[in-house]
Amino acid sequence: MTAARLQARSLSVGYGERLVVSDLDLDVLSGSVTAVIGPNGCGKSTLLRALGRLLPARSGSVLLDGERIDRTPTREVAKVLAMLPQSPQAPEGLTVAELVARGRHPHQAWYRQWSPEDEAAVASALEMTGMAELAGQTVDELSGGQRQRAWISMALAQGTDLLLLDEPTTYLDLAHQIDVLDLVQRLHRESGRTVVMVLHDLNLAARYADRLVAMKDGRIVVSGPPADVLTEANLLEVFGLDARVVPDPVAGTPLVIPIGHRHRTPER
């Protein structure tokens, strides 16, 4: 049986007095690609931030390799887990190489500054993402897809095998969405990285993830393989969406086809 790298146990998380995620249990299996889906405001990003130790738990816990993440030193967590928030912003004038080099901070200390190992990690990350030729450009000069690959490069330079991505395709056109998700899939296949990402596009989630977690109102409604999660009944329950689900003619994964008002069969 595949072990869980990251777990939530009776996890509740919120902002101020508002509870967003309530009494939630989740297992992220080692070597899996998990996509968290659900309507706006259901708690997807809040859950991811809690899993990445960016938000403290109100109650319950997050476990990283079986140990409570809130009791693990920050630097040690950063050597194992990398998280990219939604729409990250780089300081003006920062080059791609300088951004990627920031991924090496968890591996440095006052007695050990920049090393040949750091240099090699940055070069490898740039090569893996196809960004080596753009290393000298500033981040603000890049296209949306290139910018996202630069941030992923930084996460790769961090040297972790657990990657959390909060809506990595936001504000990208379809071609760049595919480009970024192809990269994530390749990184997973070549290195066995465990990936958790929040995605809005259900069809892309089904195509690129081997496990879906569907949330509503701060709770997990259903989780499992895409074919088990993206059913017409579940789409209606989670999204209030009347839709048909057919096999994707390219990938064979579930393809969600929403039904507009004009195309609904009249009730008898």
What would you call each of these model-derived segments?
Residues 6, 21-23:
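Conserved structural motif at the start of ABC-family nucleotide-binding domains
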Residues 37-39:
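The feature captures the beta-strand-to-loop junction immediately N-terminal to the Walker
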Residues 52:
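Helix-to-loop junction immediately C-terminal to a conserved catalytic motif
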Residues 60-68, 77:
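Conserved ABC transporter NBD signature motif
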Residues 101, 116-134:
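Conserved ABC ATPase "signature" region
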Residues 113, 138-142, 146:
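Conserved ABC ATPase signature
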Residues 163-167:
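Catalytic Walker B motif of ABC-type/P-loop ATPase nucleotide-binding domains
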